[in-house]
Regions:
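Short N-terminal targeting/anchoring amphipathic segment
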Residues: 13, 23-43, 57-59, 197
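Active-site proximal beta-strand in glycosyltransferases
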Residues: 31-34, 50-68
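Membrane-proximal helix-turn-helix segments that form the acceptor-binding/catalytic region
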Residues: 48-57, 70-90
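Donor nucleotide-sugar binding/catalytic pocket of nucleotide-sugar-dependent glycosyltransferases
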Residues: 88-102, 106-122
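Nucleotide-activated donor-binding/catalytic signature segment of Leloir-type glycosyltransferases, i.e.
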Residues: 164-193
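Acidic donor-binding loop of glycosyltransferase active sites
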Residues: 186-202, 215
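Short hydrophobic beta-strand element within catalytic cores of glycosyltransferases
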Residues: 196, 216-221, 226
């Protein structure tokens, strides 16, 4: 396996040229294409054009049945269907997602590969008894209604972490700058439980990080988050 360098754009995401059909007119010496993330900027027509242009087999990992960054899933599902129909091999992360792929997208022979570890060497911290929510910059796929968090705080001790400038009105928050990996792992590891206030999506690397750190997780009833549990008592819906 050879890892090719990505361009350095100050750490920002960039659209990979391999999603352009034109890229494959003079293709690199590769044996297959693996798509996992990063195609939501393409229209269904452009994805169809890509599928027609691919000179090598496609392996598709379906991480997101519903894209957490999009409110309207219509075009995402169209793109996904095109890629599923083209794929020579399909992978997803949970049995629940595999069932949905078969039921809603006609997918067959979906291989389930659980989410890989995020944290290889956890920071040693003493776990606490407080619940924690990490909202960062309050993205569009998380609950932004402060009352939601007040209701939780009325039942359990709660810490709500947000980036500076993203504070929620009339609720106490722990305001912080973006954390390093070690700082984040220590903050999560000190929580008695981590709450994921997602309104859409399918699987979560954040959930996997919590489990790597030994922290139980409360998840929403959307998506396939509960299917990522490594033990029955690890995740509560």
């Amino acid at each position: 396996m050879e890892f090719l360098p990505d361009p350095d754009i100050d750490g920002n995401w960039w659209p990979h040229p391999a999603f352009e059909a034109e890229f494959w007119r003079d293709p690199p010496a590769v044996d297959l294409v693996h798509i996992h993330f990063g195609f939501e900027h393409r229209t269904p027509a452009q994805i169809a054009e890509l599928c027609r242009a691919l000179p090598v087999p496609l392996v598709l990992t379906v991480h997101d049945l519903d894209n957490p960054h999009l409110e309207d899933q219509t075009e995402h599902h169209e793109r996904l269907q095109l890629l599923i129909d083209e794929a020579s091999a399909l992978i997803t992360l949970t049995d629940q997602a595999a069932g949905i792929l078969a039921r809603d997208f006609g997918a067959r022979d979906v291989r389930v590969v659980p989410h890989p570890r995020i944290v290889e060497e956890p920071v040693a911290v003493e776990p606490g008894d407080r619940a924690a929510v990490f909202l960062k910059s309050v993205r569009s796929n998380v609950v932004s209604d402060a009352q939601f968090y007040r209701d939780i705080a009325a039942q359990v001790p709660l810490d709500v972490y947000v980036h500076g400038g993203a504070e929620l009105a009339s609720i106490g928050t722990v305001v912080h700058e973006p954390m390093s990996d070690d700082e984040l792992h220590a903050a999560v590891g000190r929580a008695g439980v981590c709450i994921l206030p997602y309104t859409r999506g399918t699987h979560s690397g954040w959930l996997e990080m919590c489990r790597d750190l030994g922290v139980p997780v409360a998840v929403p009833d959307c998506g396939c988050y509960a299917g990522q549990a490594d033990t029955p008592d690890a995740v509560e819906v």
